[in-house]
C-alpha cells in the first residue's frame, strides 16, 4: 500500500524600465519609465493511492497484481480520477523436475502480464478550462479568450499485453524475447477547429490506436577467462502502429502530418512529385482532382493550387527495426565499453534542407544542390528553375531515409588491484575516460534523426560530442 502526492508550482515575474540617471545602476526603482511588466503562476498537482501484492510458490510460480488510482489537476473534478491495474504471472520451467537433467539450460522462464496505465500529458496545465488574456488596445485594457474549455477531458488509458521468455543457455548465452500489444484509448490531442470560430484547436480525447511489436535482447560471453572477458549484447525492436478510431471525423491534418484511421500516427501527408518539366523547368505534381475538385484519372500538372486536395500518405517516421549493440571488454584491471545504436527504415522531412532548396527567394542561404537547377529547355534535373516569388510545395521527394548508425559512447577505465587497495584500506578506486556522441552515420546532413517522434526536422542542434574524465572511490 502507498500514497504519493506531487505538486509543481512555477512563479515568474519580469519588468523592464528605462531612463536611468547614470550608468552602473541595477535597481529598477532608479529608472524613470516603465517599459514592460509581466507575471505568471502555474500550478499542477497529482495524487495517487497504490497497492501491490506478490506471491511466490516453490520458487517456480510467481504471481503479482497491482491497483492504483490517480487524480490530476489537469482534468475537471467529474473526471479527475482514473483507476489503473495490472496482473502478471511467470513460470520458471527450468526449476521443474523434468528439466533437471537438461544441463545446458541454466534458466528458462515464461511470463505474461496485462494491465492498464494512465496519461494526463495534454501539454497544458489547464486543458479543461477556458483561459483569457489581458490585452491593451490603444489607451484601453481588455480581456480576450485565448483557449476553449473541455470539461469532458479525461485520462488517456493504455492497456498493455506482454508475453515473453527468458533463457540462460550453456552458462554463456542470455536471451530475452517479449511480444507486446498496447491499446491506447481516449488519445489526448489537440483537435483542429475551423479558424472562423477564433480558435484553431482545442484539447480533446480524440480516439484510439494500437502498437504491436517485439523486443529481443541477446547477450553472449564470447570470451570468459580469468584475464580477458568479452561480452556482446544486442538489442532489437520492431513495432507497428495503427490509429483505430478518431472521434467526430476519420482524419486530422496537421501541417505535413496526418492522423488517419488505419494509418500510423504522424504519417506524412504530402503531394507526390512528378519531377521537373524539361521544357519549362516548372515543378510537376501528380494530382487526381480537377479545378472543380472532382476526382479524375491521375495526371501531371504544375498548378500548385491543385495539390492541396491531392495529397497522399507517403510514409512515416516509425522504423522497421531499431536497437543497440554493446561490447564490454575486461583485461586484468582495464575495462572498455563501446555502445552503438542503429535504426533501419522510416522517413524524415528535412525542413532545413527544403528551405535551402527553395531557390525562388533572394536573401536565403542556398544549398549546393541548387546548382543542379533547370536552366534551359531540355535540361533533365530534379531541381526546378529559379523564379522570383515562385510557390513550390513540399512533396514526397523531400523525404529522407531516417536510417542511422551511431557510436553513442566509449568508456575506458582502470581499477586498482585488490593488492594495492588492501594497502591503502580502500574498497575500490577506478579512473575512467568517457566520450559521448562520437559519430553519426545518416542520410541527414547536420541534423540528428534519433530524437524526433514526428519525423520533421527543424532548426535544432545535433547532440554535442562530450569528453570527460572521472574517478570512483569507495571506502
What are these regions (language model features)?
Residues 1, 44-76, 80-95, 158-159, ...:
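Surface-exposed extracellular loop regions of Gram-negative outer-membrane beta-barrel proteins
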Residues 5-21, 75-79, 101-103, 116-130, ...:
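Outer-membrane beta-barrel and related beta-rich outer-membrane complex signature
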Residues 9-39, 124-149, 195-202, 253-264, ...:
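Surface-exposed loop/turn segments flanking beta-strands in extracellular/periplasmic regions
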Residues 33-50, 135-175, 202-225, 262-267, ...:
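Outer-membrane beta-barrel signature, preferentially recognizing the C-terminal barrel domain
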Residues 34, 127, 206-211, 256-282, ...:
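C-terminal beta-signal and terminal closure region of outer-membrane beta-barrel proteins
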Residues 60, 94-108, 172, 223-230, ...:
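Short loop/turn motifs that connect adjacent beta-strands in outer-membrane beta-barrel proteins
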Residues 72, 343-431, 435:
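Extracytoplasmic gating/loop element in the C-terminal half of outer-membrane beta-barrel translocons
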Residues 204, 223-317:
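Conserved small-residue
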